[in-house]
């Protein structure tokens, strides 16, 4: 999964797996977010953690790292944030450190460990935010969406504040609905969003799921999302419960990787 220079943006690189871009980073411009879903993650951060005072230090855990675009943005947006990244690909991490070094005192620590092992080693009530953005090639590993792992994520959350998950799927979203069912059993509030074309079944694409102990400012999120070049449509409440329907959460006994891509352009971490 090499780092490939972006010829249209000097100094920036893509992390590429096959024909899929896994990450895009300009180390000199951590505020510059190219991938649509990463922009939406930034909006979830703004509207989901709005109640945290500026003087309060936030702790964030990332399951999956790639080029560290989201950790870099958080460090830029909220300096002093403590961030731990669980990234099992030590070779990729070394290449990122060499070609896209983190700024001094970024607060970002990368551990060469998979998500389940990394989370199991962490103390309870540690994190204000968990970002699950991990792919094995073009698939989300099934072990990261099973109920047993979601229990571990719930254990980490201070006040069960927020978990943001990036996955890929297509209509009728059978796999994502099962994942959403597991999140809904453990967190009071849940949002699911994607681009209208994905909702309508026109193509395969990224979906974001945001589970939280306190309600996200959904009105503000929808307003700011609508201003983006590729806005997301967000569902919650009764509409979301109807969408989940009778889907049963995954467990370790029947876990499945996410569905394979169907040729659409996908953005990962």
Predicted regions and their residues:
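SAM/dcSAM-binding transferase cores
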Residues: 1-6, 22-30, 199-269
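The AdoMet/dcAdoMet-binding core of the Class I SAM-like
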Residues: 9, 13, 32-155, 173, ...
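A short, structured beta-strand/loop element
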Residues: 9-25
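A short, flexible beta-alpha/helix-coil linker loop
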Residues: 20-24, 135-138, 170
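A generic structural signal for alpha->beta connector loops
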Residues: 80-82, 105-107, 160, 187-189, ...
